[in-house]
Amino acid sequence: MRFSPELEQGRLLVRYKRFLADIETDSGELLTIHCPNTGSMLNCMMPGGRVWFSRSNDPKRKLPGTWEISETPQGRLACINTGRANTLVEEALRAGVIRELEGFTALKREVAYGQEKSRVDFRLEYPDGYLYLEVKSVTLGFADSAVAAFPDAVTQRGARHLRELATLAREGVRAVLLYCVNLTGIEAVRPAKEIDPAYAAALREAVDAGVQILAYGVQLTPEAVYIDRHLEVHWPD
């Protein structure tokens, strides 16, 4: 996926009220932009750090700018716009990049399912059945490791999705969780048990129930981002 129009650059001043950020562009313009990420963004919002943002020409938008990429203290790039993950996964699915899920004949997005009335990101239909696919965007990295982690904040919603997937798997339905690691320089991903032990426990229960866990990394520049490789999933002791 190419960023269109081209992204603009700036420096982060502060993120606040979760969905807002003040930045200074390279031309010296002070802007308040939208932050499309509900997480803590633990290594992606360093004051003074470089950011890239898109600008909309839609006159109805209150904030024309949207934060897209951060440079982390480790020098990595992170696509912090969580809304991009599903687009990237759909592109990769249609291009056959995600080999474990090849062969589908139809793809549907945002399908209602489960006892807790969740909406799954994708339903893929095959000649012999179907599967449900949930996608999580990962941006949490560490200075001393090439292993990313999820989540970066406590996520009851994420645990609910795992319970729903586990229920499907127990009923004989193929259920898949895919971590889209939107962070450069990463070789694997793991559950962030130190941040959300309840999520880590729910993930283990989902795996035991038969949920398939996949992880894929991206090629990311300020010009484009796309899924390009399979990553390992590491489990805490």
UniProtKB/Swiss-Prot annotation:
Pfam families found in the cross-reference section: SfsA, SfsA_N
Similarity-based family: Belongs to the SfsA family.
Organism of provenance: Pseudomonas syringae pv. tomato (strain ATCC BAA-871 / DC3000)
CDD domains associated with the record: SfsA-like_bacterial
Positions in coiled-coil regions: none
GO molecular function, one term: DNA binding
Name by which UniProt lists this protein: Sugar fermentation stimulation protein homolog
